UniProtKB/Swiss-Prot annotation:
Name of the gene: Abra
Annotated spans, Interaction with actin: 234-279, 346-375
Location of region: Disordered: 1-20, 38-99, 173-204
Role this protein plays: Acts as an activator of serum response factor (SRF)-dependent transcription possibly by inducing nuclear translocation of MKL1 or MKL2 and through a mechanism requiring Rho-actin signaling.
Subunit structure: Binds F-actin and ABLIM1, ABLIM2 and ABLIM3. Interaction with ABLIM2 and ABLIM3 enhances activity.
Transmembrane segments: none
Location of this chain's protein in the cell: Cytoplasm, Myofibril, Sarcomere; Cytoplasm, Cytoskeleton
Species: Mus musculus
Family annotation (InterPro entries): Abra, Costars_dom, Costars_sf
Gene3D superfamilies attached to this UniProt entry: Costar domain (1.10.10.1540)
Protein name in UniProt: Actin-binding Rho-activating protein
Biased composition (Basic and acidic residues): 1-11, 79-99, 173-182
Length: 375
């Protein structure tokens, strides 16, 4: 038989086999979905009605008793034929091929919504537990300072308590002697007897504590002390003073800055340093220019130390102990590390670390110049 005829005969057989496989796959999928629907409806019927905030313990998962008017859940698939009843009963016991996976919640509620739910539930649990506010009294100041509230509020409360304490301490140190303003008392002589009474007749003094005079006598004096303490230890006044100090310094610096519109030539000429004065030719201490100059000096010092190390490793030692190398050899080796070899050599000679002839070195012309390491 020719190969073309075999392919023609095998074509209908393959298509029929493909149709049978597709139909079988569809039937199995439908049965799997039907089995999943039955199991899910049974689980939903067995679950409790719901959860209430007042109930702290979960209800037992007991199946509900079927009432006389309760009907079984309806299935979504049509009734099977008589011939397929046996197959359906056998396949119902098989494990479903549908994959199950728990889906986590990705939508998160806002911060104030979460806080409201947690506060409501915590308040409900505290009330159910029987803990009342009357049984456990708490100081308001301690509750504010020790609670996990806003740090700004806690800082303000702490500053207020410290200011009041300092004010009372100042009042205790001054200890003014209060005298009654009543005319009848002065005429009767009771006030003088109390003031002239000797100290040995007085009652034993109680432990040291903050003296608080009567409000009717010391109202004006206490207000004055509180105002003084508030002005002395006020955070706003301190911040205002620092800001004013910075503003004054900025105005003064702008008057001395030649690039500023507020530059004062006469003031700059009268305050400038002359040659020989301390700090002449150097930036102002504490300025950004001084910091950059310090970093530049440290960088140049590291470059000089690296140059001396390279000369020491590649040079030949003489009998007298000196280390020498020619400029051509050093340039060929050092140009791979840095292209500023000439500038670093000039700086090292200024510090007395190396020595060579001439004021300047040129590649090609001064390759024979000998460089001696002095350290």
């Amino acid at each position: 038989m020719a190969p073309g005829e075999r392919e023609r005969e095998a074509g209908p057989a393959k298509s029929a086999l493909r149709k049978v496989r597709t139909a079988t796959l569809v039937i199995n999928l439908a049965r799997g979905w039907q089995q999943w629907a039955n199991e899910n409806s049974t689980k939903q019927a067995q679950e409790p009605a719901g959860w209430l905030p007042g109930a702290t313990h979960d209800l037992p998962n007991a199946p509900k008793e079927a009432g006389p008017y309760q009907h079984a859940p309806k299935t979504l698939s049509p009734k099977p034929d008589r011939d397929g009843e046996g197959q359906h009963s056998e396949e119902a016991t098989e494990v479903s091929h549908i994959k199950r996976k728990e889906v986590t919640r990705t939508v998160v509620s806002k911060a104030y919504e979460r806080g409201g739910d947690v506060n409501y539930l915590s308040h409900r649990y505290e009330n159910d537990g029987g803990v009342s506010e009357a049984i456990q009294p708490e100081n308001d100041i301690d509750r504010i300072l020790l609670s996990h509230d806003s740090p700004t509020r806690r800082r303000k409360c702490t500053n207020l308590v410290s200011e009041l304490t300092k004010g009372w301490k100042v009042m205790e140190q001054e200890e003014p002697t209060w005298k009654s303003d009543s005319v009848d008392t002065e005429d009767s002589g009771y006030g003088g007897d109390m003031e002239e009474r000797p100290e040995q007749d007085a009652a034993p003094v109680a432990p040291a504590r903050i003296k608080r005079p009567l409000l009717s006598q010391a109202n004006r004096y206490s207000e004055t002390l509180n105002c003084k303490a508030h002005r002395k230890y006020s955070q706003v006044d301190n911040l205002k003073g620092r800001w004013q100090q910075w503003a004054d310094e900025h105005v003064q610096s702008q008057k001395l800055n030649p690039f500023s519109d507020e530059f004062d030539y006469d003031l700059a000429m009268s305050t400038r340093l002359h040659k020989g004065d301390e700090g002449y030719g150097r930036p102002k201490e504490g300025s950004k220019t001084a910091e950059r100059a310090k970093r530049a000096e440290e960088h140049i010092y590291r470059e000089i130390m690296e140059l001396c190390f390279v000369i020491r490793t590649m040079a030949r030692h003489r009998r007298d102990g000196k280390i020498q190398v020619t400029f051509g050899e050093l340039f060929d080796r050092y140009v791979r590390i840095s292209d500023k070899v000439v500038g670093i050599l000039m700086r090292a000679r200024k510090h007395g670390l190396v020595h060579f002839e001439g004021e300047m070195l040129w590649q090609g012309r001064d390759d024979h110049v000998v460089i001696t390491l002095l350290e």
